[in-house]
């Protein structure tokens, strides 16, 4: 696969292959990196065609990216309170050209807004 050249990869970051249809993820080895638990968790999530998914504490965005790669869910939202992690996850979404199906939001949902779909 060809990596987009309009996505910034900082010197302290690395790009890892998710071994799923050429999908990649940006990670900072000095910060949190996803583990096998995230991959296993994404395997347990049964997402049906047309469903929306919310991943709380998305970190690197690994779960929404994996679920978008392997399911027919409509939209995947990753919610992350750490600015740096949210920004890095957003770049991973762009790197994989998944912005139509995956969005990363920084902050927390304190508004009590209703969520329809699957909560991961």
Q: Which ranges hold each PLM region?
A:
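Class I SAM-dependent transferase core
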Residues: 5-48
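Conserved SAM/SAH cofactor-binding pocket of Class I
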Residues: 43-120
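Short, Lys/Arg-enriched N-terminal segments with co-localized hydrophobic residues
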Residues: 1-2
């Amino acid at each position: 696969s060809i990596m987009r050249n309009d996505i910034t990869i900082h010197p302290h970051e690395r790009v890892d292959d998710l071994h799923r249809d050429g999908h990649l993820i940006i990670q900072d080895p000095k910060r949190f990196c996803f583990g096998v638990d995230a991959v296993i968790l994404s395997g347990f999530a049964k997402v049906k065609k047309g469903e929306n998914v919310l991943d709380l504490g998305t970190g690197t965005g690994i779960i929404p990216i994996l679920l978008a790669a392997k399911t027919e869910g409509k939209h995947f939202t990753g919610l992350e309170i750490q600015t740096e992690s949210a920004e890095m996850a957003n770049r991973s979404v762009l790197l994989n050209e998944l912005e139509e199906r995956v969005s990363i939001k920084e902050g927390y949902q304190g508004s009590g807004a209703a969520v329809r779909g699957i909560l991961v």
